[in-house]
Amino acid sequence: MPGLHVVSFLVVLLLQLRSSGMHLVASELFWGNTLPNGDIYVGSFDGLVPHGPGKYMWTDGALYDGEWDKSKMTGRGLIQWPSGASYEGDFRGGFIDGAGTFKGVDGSVYKGSWRMNKKHGMGTMVYSNSDTYEGFWNEGLPDEFGKYTWADGNVYIGRWKSGKMNGSGVMQWINGDTLDCNWLNGLAHGKGYCKYASGACYIGTWDRGLKDGHGTFYQPGSKIPCNLEVSDCLTSHDGTSASSSSNEKITIGLLFLLQKLCKNWRLRRFLHRPRRISNGTTPVFDDNSGSHLCQDVSSKSFSADDQCLQDSEVDKDSVYEREYVQGVLIMEQPKNEDSRMSESGIAQENNWEKQAKGPMETIYKGHRSYYLMLNLQLGIRYTVGKITPVPLREVRSNDFGPRARIKMYFPCEGSQYTPPHYSVDFFWKDYCPMVFRNLREMFHIDAADYMMSICGGDSLKELSSPGKSGSIFYLSQDERFVIKTLRKTELKIGLMKYVLQILLKMLPKYYNHVKAYDNTLITKFFGVHRITLKPGRKVRFVVMGNMFCTELRIHRKYDLKGSTQGRSTKKQNINENTTLKDLDLSYVFHVDKPWREALFRQIALDCMFLESQSIIDYSMLLGIHFRAPNHLKRITSCQNALESTGISAETECSVALHHEETISSKGFLLVAADEPGPAVRGSHIRGSMVRAAEGGYEEVDLVLPGTGRFRVQLGVNMPARARKVQEDVNVEVENRDTIEEYDVVLYLGIIDILQEYNVSKRVEHAVKSLKFDPLSISAVDPNLYSRRFISFLEKVFPEQD
């Protein structure tokens, strides 16, 4: 049995223990004798090592009093530091590990779980400024799910990542305003719903904490979709919080479980309306700040159905369509009552939380595309891993032929060449692997990055609205690549050839064209694959570069062909994710003269190539990022204040903007590319930089104040001036100062290049020509198509005066 005894020479033992990696080790002295290094240990030993209860004091004044196991602190104990900080709780293997309470020098207190000296698991932190966080921790930071309460009464409850609000969550301010939104790095980012204390509300999109894009504003008394109402029954009749008076309590851990189990379960029903007013704050996680988190919240449920107004009670002018750019209101108009009261309009508003996912949803286990995604990832990982070790060389004619294929069978249990997997058995075919390997190299796409982007630990995202053809689109998690399925609905009628075969037929000339012209705007293809399932079902995929892979928000998207027949979108079908068409375009874009010349020079070359392949139906995909003029940002706070009172910004903010001439209205700056500072380069872009007249015909970078610095290349990060086209010519001439103009950043490229002008298209042209103007329909001769296409774009990008 271990016993108490005195050891007069423990220097060797002390050094051995410390050399084992322990910074808290012990030797024993009895009756106050001191070790040669000045430390003191009094306690129980097992042989020559501390074991059992004991107390160790360091020369700097730190003290541990607790249990030991084979020279390591293990079990319950108390440690006090000279600074005044202390910890009491569980230890394991010499580390703070388990449940315990830490008290900081600044008065902050953490009570909860630990792992390896870091907060990990469930715990509550009361910071020195009286802020509190209650929830889950990971590696010392709030993570996963929790509730943060500021000292002034503001509350956030929802998801966290690495100490910041990240994911779905609800923020409620002390004045009663509530924001139910997605969050990113501590800022509102994504689709959200804001309910003001006045009764007004706004449904729209936030970008890095600012309203951005289209939304709907409801004044007090207007009809609000029923499932958006926050019930007043959360506040009792005497004005106190129902959550504080309820006998039923629910912990943060159970809230987390409920949210995971119930996708439509709303956190905001657990937030009550406070009574006093205070400004909002943003949490900062360090030793000197934090949040006051309630130990529990009310589980009292409610129904908001009885609060919805009848249609007859609604003023048609009490609902407004709005558009914001970086928090600045640039458009407001009464919402069209027909679209608002239509079945599709009501369904769209009532399903705002489904829209919150954006135009895509992450593929999860149980999703209809889950096994297809696993098969695709397994196949790409196998192919890229097989082709990458082969020395890079120029492609040969046989690299395009029918034998240029990689085939493999993937059984669930695995084989000599394939790993076991959790999907279904399938056959894999990869087309022209050496050609696409060279194309990826051409665009500086590293093989490892390519696999991680598509086949990494994260799932792919499926676009919620497939195209007319029935194809389904997937995005890699980093959104660098688009994966499109090629279905039988895209067969060439009569010839019965898949679009895939069209691509493979034109691949040799496509390869030469892309190699010859660095700045080509044509779609970049990086792989073609086929999956065959056991019943014989075949799914073909093509991997392409994503034109809109940018951290900037794309406010408008247009698909421009140059034809007019059927080239408009019904207003009731338009939302912020809609890709608009030719007749919907109400802007022209002025770009720098050298950029315009380079742009149309490349468009002409690309159209010449497509014409040589008898390709039609291609289009220019145009993405627009609007920049808010600096002088308009100064009235943002005014607009936000008006919203909280439910007053229309169109009514109250109709005053003229008188700003100093010294304040620039530019939403961006151009700087020389050789100036110091990192610039973000477009994904899978290899073309040379374009030269700007404004920059003295030198290569330039685009600087967006408050956002970053971007490399300007043809079709990527291109700054321009957008001018709204006025229908009334006289207004345009006489009131040029009132013309709407915006600084914009453009992204563009030519897509849908896999439709030949074949027999079916000739028949389509003949039939439609009987009813419509032959020049207005899309199906025309390739030569006419390319000339009409370029002519239309010249009007979209006119020469500057």
Swiss-Prot record:
The UniProt record lists the keyword Kinase: yes
Q: What is its EC number?
A: 2.7.1.68
Which catalysed reactions does the entry list for this protein?
Answer: a 1,2-diacyl-sn-glycero-3-phospho-(1D-myo-inositol 4-phosphate) + ATP = a 1,2-diacyl-sn-glycero-3-phospho-(1D-myo-inositol-4,5-bisphosphate) + ADP + H(+)
For this entry, list what GO says about its biological process.
cell differentiation; flower development; phosphatidylinositol phosphate biosynthetic process
Q: Which domain of life is it from?
A: Eukaryota
Query: Which N-terminal stretch is annotated as signal sequence?
Result: 1-21
Q: Which UniProt keywords apply?
A: ATP-binding, Developmental protein, Differentiation, Flowering, Kinase, Nucleotide-binding, Repeat, Signal, Transferase
Additional information: Transgenic plants suppressing PIPK1 show earlier heading (7 to 14 days earlier), delayed leaf development (a common phenotype observed with earlier flowering), and greater expression of floral induction genes.
Q: What role does it play? A: Involved in flowering. May suppress floral initiation by modifying the expression of genes related to floral induction.
Q: What is this protein called?
A: Phosphatidylinositol 4-phosphate 5-kinase 1
Q: Which organism is it from?
A: Oryza sativa subsp. japonica (Rice)
**Which gene is the coding source of this polypeptide chain?**
PIPK1
